[in-house]
């Protein structure tokens, strides 16, 4: 018997060794194709993204602006056709008004061919949309939400010569959510097909558009100019881009010489328009406003979440956009509004960080109100200004008679106003004014001259410092709320950690004067000088680097021009400089003849610094020849982060996934109907998210759980119909493709943000791999004793009174590695209990490897990346994504245990089980984590109140504060308590009980003056009542920063009747029973006599009736006989009567 492999053919031929030449040929073809794609990748392919309206989907060249902010009802008819699908036809499916049209391009290649090639190879663009929460956390709860979608391919609806040659694009819905106007769109591939690097777009809502009578979109703030002239930029220098960081949906940029025009962009200058503003530009100069000339130039322009501010001469205007996802439509402006009409405003100062649910703008005055400042507050689109100080001037508190406030910055969370004040002698002061307590303090007297700091990187300004003859010329202030770093800048840079002691950064030359400063709020800063130089430095360090112009910039710029880059030119002008997601971007106008254009380009600081790095080397003898040995500028070879919390868990981001429905089309192309279904499903998914606020804990606290709860058992049947082309409309809806994600793949790297609740902590492990010579000394091959110093890491906490940090270092000599375990713990000191998003303490942690900043550059496909330095924001307070829920399942189980029984209502309701009045009621609660999917028992303290109630669900009413006190307080003396407990702990004012999971429970009372007293049954079932309960841990719980507030309804049945009504019922029942007994007794006694009397009466009646009948008969017979004799002859013999009569006679 011959044994063969399981898959060998059944034949008498022995198995032979396979010929592998064909395999190697195929492998070579595959490698060549991969090589060709690698070459394409080196050509820097990039994603393309435009916004399409719902009705324009499929039009290849269509492009729209994000003007409509309400869902539309356009998909209902399509969903009605989807029979035999898991959707509920009774639901009202809406859609979003826009699609995202996606494609990609590579230099020198046809876009249409690239798209077709990518689709046939299986490439699918993945789209992740991240929503930024609103500034006003009082109106909109802070939450971080993202949704991951897969783009669906669709052929263009335009003319094409052949089906295979049609223009191909990918589409996804463009969803939006209430409370958000800023959304970033990340696009990347599914890993199949051509390589296109991940790219981020900003698709923000535009609330500054209107429609004319014909329905055409127009700008409400001005008139769009179709031509961007080079003269606009020849005469204008670069200017700062001012906006509320992370929350401004549009950017505006003024500064065009003698023109009331601004650059406007709702995509972070991915595209833009030039607008001529529709403002009056009237001149109101007077004796109190010392401005010498008039100019139409827009000098200052600031963008906030909803409102734009501009300054022209001394006039200030604002325009509030129409954002119905943030506030009522009536808050929007119809025209520019002029504010502070009687003031002469010399400057607007931005406030980059919001606070207290509002945004702020500062207006500096001159003239009659010199020494005062106007604080503008923007809340829900409503603008108000307040002049401070009230009743006295800042100048009154400083030496000299007059002063001038040259710059101001506002720390909203502290309510501190930092002022750069110049007195009449020319001396500058740093002044702090507290807007809450109305106090003013002089923090620092700025030196008059530049310090002498030869051959030093920095200099601490003490009394022993010597100074040069160059005057200090302060120009402005900058404060970073995340690390408490304050900068004073001009022809110098001063930095301070405590606003009282300053460090002079000596690398910045005193010959240059800073024009403006920009910050990434991720540890990086850049400044632009009057000569358009760009300098760069890392916060917490002391080295300042000139990046433009520099040797590195010349090298990089020339290489780009050699590659014929469309972003570089021989003749160009810097328009502005700003950070976006930690990367530094330039807005540059290129003066190429016939191709003048404005471009947004990345300034690769890492690459420029790498080009600028020195190349130290030594010549060493190796035998008979000499060799060059380069010295490492970076102290480590590699750096790795391990044991890092997941990004979306640390940043408290709720993630959803929505994939397009499968279609039966042979090439996998979608059409308008299938995309409409995709729209409806995405809308319903986010609608479930927004409406998920169930007070009763579900078995699975996922918004999508109930969506498919009763349909999952039929999923095989639905797939069977689709696979056999029997599904309606040729669509298959995969229920697993619309769900919440708790563990995302590829979620690696250090998080961009950490949220810490009370006493919480997180750990990060940093592994530093050294070069071969790090662990050896110059004269010995053995390990040195200074390894920990060569590979040292520093951890700096911005607020050490709030956080504690420990670093544990392990040296692995055999691995040439140093492991640093970092643990950060909240000290429970710096935040107060509050709702989600409120009372947040914003701080940060900085990681820095000794000698790494500026010396360690990692080369990547996207350019050089600075290594060895990282700033991580930390928010201390109640983290988003946590909620309190009533654990009804465990409450019922525990009730059955302590009461030895559990009786539900006769008519059961699975959503709201009943509890018996006479049973002890001990509620339990869950803390549900909507980000991680975890849930656990709430072990803190809380206050329980009955705040409403009714006999039915429809008649529940809310009680007044007085009623709540009477119904719940142990101090009540009106006999109105609804419940009581044996708990002895109460609030400080003794008004309410403080309970916990260990409390003995609630005993229902329903006393005489309570609303549940003496409930009359409406049927044969016992009385019942619905209580509206409020549970809050505010002020009584020390286990969390979260102010949990839960309102839920408890259904109680078996309520007793009042004593009066009970007595009345007993009396009535007893009386009725006694009467019935007496009646029965009387009946039993009298009945025989009644029967006898009745019988006697019947006998007599019968006799009487019989007698009367007899006499009547007899008399009638006698009369008849006499009458017969008178008419007839004598009777015949033989008659008995005759014989009797004869005898008688």
From Swiss-Prot:
InterPro entries: CATSPERG, CATSPERG_b-prop, CATSPERG_C, CATSPERG_Ig-like, CATSPERG_N
Membrane topology term: Single-pass type I membrane protein
Annotated transmembrane regions: 1062-1083
Residue spans, topological domain Cytoplasmic: 1084-1145
Coiled-coil ranges (or none): none
Pfam families: CATSPERG_beta-prop (PF15064), CATSPERG_C (PF22846), CATSPERG_Ig-like (PF22851), CATSPERG_NTD (PF22840)
Disulfide bonds: 45-106, 160-166, 289-344, 395-403, 634-856, 802-830, 878-1042, 905-914, 1006-1012
Extracellular side of membrane: 39-1061
Superkingdom of the source species: Eukaryota
Organ and tissue specificity: Testis-specific. Specifically expressed in the principal piece of the sperm tail (at protein level). Expressed in spermatocytes and spermatids within the seminiferous tubule but not in interstitial cells.
Note: Catsperg2 is absent in sperm from mice lacking Catsper1, suggesting that stable expression requires Catsper1.
PANTHER family per the UniProt record, alphabetical: CATION CHANNEL SPERM-ASSOCIATED AUXILIARY SUBUNIT GAMMA (PTHR14327:SF1), CATION CHANNEL SPERM-ASSOCIATED PROTEIN SUBUNIT GAMMA (PTHR14327)
Family: Belongs to the CATSPERG family.
Name recorded for this polypeptide: Cation channel sperm-associated auxiliary subunit gamma 2
Organism: Mus musculus (Mouse)
Taxonomic placement: Eukaryota, Metazoa, Chordata, Craniata, Vertebrata
